[in-house]
Amino acid sequence: IGMSVVKSNRAAISFGTTSTLQMAVKKYFEPQPYMPAYPAVPNDMFNPEFEVYRGFWMISWFIEQFAAKDKVDAAEEGVCIERYLDDKIKDIEAGSGGLILQPFWTPGITNPNASGAIIGFSDFHTRYHLYRAIIEGICLELYHGLVKMQKRSSVTVDELYAGGGGSSSPVVCQIAADVFGLPVHRIQTHEASAVGCAMVAFISQGVYSSYEDAIEHMVHKKDVFIPNEENHRTYMKIYGKAYSHLASRLKPIEKYLHHFQTGGH
């Protein structure tokens, strides 16, 4: 509710340590088999959710492992490292030159053997292509989740609202808009959970009469990112011809690697 997602045509993306995509629906459904939807704060709704467990944690991982020089350069320019990297990737074409990343640095509950994968390296790729591929991989996986949830619910989402620390980046929000082919809205703060908690408190004290009333007074759209249709077509080709097949093709390999990593041979 902190991002005003109380209508079934809207979904909330959290670009946090764990990256999630959450819907708000009247009719209960499981976003994945045996994975229940959360009860929503409004009593008559549910919040089915799809998550990438190591979501924007991967940004911190990349910076720690590959961006020591970039941190020095960013400090000299007087900008934070994330803004510095945004500037480095904003002109890289959609698809990162054919570099595709499956963002399972830690597996989810439903696929405990899953692992991260990067495919498509060529000699022209740089660490900045990898950085962009991380963001694209997270967005493609969340898009995959939305496709599955829309199919299971017969609900169509046509607006996205972004929160979490990663939403502070306009480059991240534009990539998300281009992947999903939907407008991505930001509100006045990326700390949308805090806004939602405050709403509940104000409603309980009678300051606002309903969630709609609280949203009207407390949630203010800051800006919106409109999809670049050419980029969206590129991402849909990547999703349809490559990304959507990765998990099933890699499953037997991941099973062995999990066995290997836990002491087997």
Task: Please provide the spans of the model-predicted regions.
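Glycine/Thr-rich phosphate-binding loops that ligate phosphate moieties of nucleotide
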Residues: 23-265
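Conserved phosphate-binding catalytic cores of ATP/NTP-utilizing and phosphoryl-transfer enzymes
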Residues: 1-10
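Acyl-thioester C-C bond-transforming condensing/cleaving domain
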Residues: 10-12, 21
